[in-house]
Swiss-Prot record:
Source organism superkingdom: Eukaryota
Name listed for the protein in its UniProt record: Small ribosomal subunit protein uS7c
Subcellular location(s) per record: Plastid, Chloroplast
One Pfam family, short name: Ribosomal_S7
Organism of this sequence: Euonymus alatus
Length: 155
C-alpha cells in the first residue's frame, strides 16, 4: 500500500473580471502559444462588443450561446468485425460544454471579419439567437447520431 497521501482535486480557476468558470474555459481554448493575457484581451473585447450589440449582460449571452451549442449525443468510431461503425454515445455536461466551446471558437475563426474579438462576438450572438455555424455543427452531429441509431448496441 502506498504511503503517499491522496492528491487534492484541482478546481478550475475563475477569471478576474467575470468570476466565471465558463469564461476561464473559453480563455484557455482561445489561448495560443501561451499568450494568456492576449486571450483575455480578445475575450473581454468580444464581451464589450456583445454588450454594445445586444444591450444585455454579455455573460448571459455567453451562457445562452454555450447552452444552445452543447450537444446531448455524439458519434464515436468503433471498429467491429473489420468495419468501422459510427456509434452514438451520450455526452456528459462537462464534455458537452468543452465541445460547444471548441465548436464556437472554430466557427468564429472561420468567419470573415476584422479581428478575433469581432468574429467571436458575432458568433456568440448568433449562437444565442439559434443560428450560426456552431449551431449547424451541433445539428449535424445530432443528425449523424440519429442516422446511426442502429449501431447504438455496440456501446
Amino acid at each position: 500500500m502506498s504511503r503517499r497521501g491522496t492528491a487534492e482535486e484541482k478546481t478550475a480557476k475563475s477569471d478576474p473580471i467575470y468570476r466565471n468558470r465558463l469564461v476561464n474555459m473559453l480563455v484557455n481554448r482561445i489561448l495560443k502559444h501561451g499568450k494568456k493575457s492576449l486571450a483575455y484581451q480578445i475575450l473581454y473585447r468580444a464581451m464589450k462588443k456583445i454588450q454594445q450589440k445586444t444591450e444585455t449582460n454579455p455573460l448571459s449571452v455567453l451562457r445562452q450561446a454555450i447552452r444552445g451549442v452543447t450537444p446531448d449525443i455524439a458519434v464515436k468510431a468503433r471498429r467491429v468485425g473489420g468495419s468501422t461503425h459510427q456509434v452514438p454515445i451520450e455526452i456528459g455536461s462537462t464534455q458537452g460544454k468543452a465541445l460547444a466551446i471548441r465548436w464556437l471558437l472554430g466557427a468564429s475563426r472561420k468567419r470573415p471579419g476584422r479581428n478575433m474579438a469581432f468574429k467571436l462576438s458575432s458568433e456568440l450572438v448568433d449562437a444565442a439567437k439559434g443560428s450560426g455555424d456552431a449551431i449547424r455543427k451541433k445539428e449535424e452531429t445530432h443528425r449523424m447520431a440519429e442516422a446511426n441509431r442502429a449501431f447504438a448496441h455496440f456501446r
